[in-house]
Amino acid sequence: TGMTWSGFRPSDDACEYHYLIPANCFAAVILGELAAIAREAWQDEAFALEALRVRREIVQGIEAYGIVHHPRFGRIYAYEADGLGHFRLMDDANVPSLLSLPYLGYLPPEDPVYQNTRAWLLSEENPCYFQGKVACGVGSEHTAAGYVWPIALAMQGLTANCFEEKERIIRLLLGTTAGCGRMHESFYADDPSQFTRPWFSWADSLCAELIYETYLKETL
């Protein structure tokens, strides 16, 4: 396939099909940056060319095996593939995720396949998307059904093109801490007082970044 093989997802759950598309997208980005470092800092053209060769193979594999046709949403990215025609349609809250592809630098947020994928994964077609009385968003197979992850909410805001969507998510994040004043790993979409991990620094950091990008970046 040209892609890198994964045994486990960012959530630490085992892969079903072992070519994890978001991880390969992230690897492609890093290989491009590594090539730039090799040229500019190390003056090692051979190393740069090898990094770009591997990057090209990964991207070709993603395009060949990681994009599938959905009857409702059109061309979308699969979460996992095996290179033999099998694939898993889902997205997990943990990063790298399909939702995070523009944040990682793999593609622009207006990319049509990404927009199709985003519409799909932010719907109940995604088995890890949960809608409750208080919140809706992407969760994870790592936690119970119905639990939304603040990491995914923050990433939804960071990759949104709409200021109103960013503001709505910030209000949701700040309003679902159950009085802890910190982001949790996950919380129950019907009742945020039911949560996992009272303090999850990864989610804290992404929430802070979303607030900075939305309100402060242009003024500092």
Feature locations, PLM:
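Extended ligand-binding clefts on enzyme/binding-domain cores
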Residues: 1-28, 40-41, 48-149
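Heptad-repeat amphipathic alpha-helical coiled-coil interaction surface used
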Residues: 28, 32-35, 55, 208, ...
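Inward-facing hydrophobic residues that define packing positions of alpha-helical scaffold repeats
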Residues: 31, 118, 169-173
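Short coil/turn linking the two alpha-helices of tandem helical-hairpin repeats
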Residues: 35, 39-42, 162, 215
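Structural signal for well-ordered, non-membrane alpha-helices
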Residues: 35, 59-63, 174-175
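Short, flexible helix-adjacent loops and helix caps
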Residues: 39-43, 67, 188, 219
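C-terminal capping/lid segments that line or modulate ligand- or cofactor-binding pockets
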Residues: 88-108, 146-220
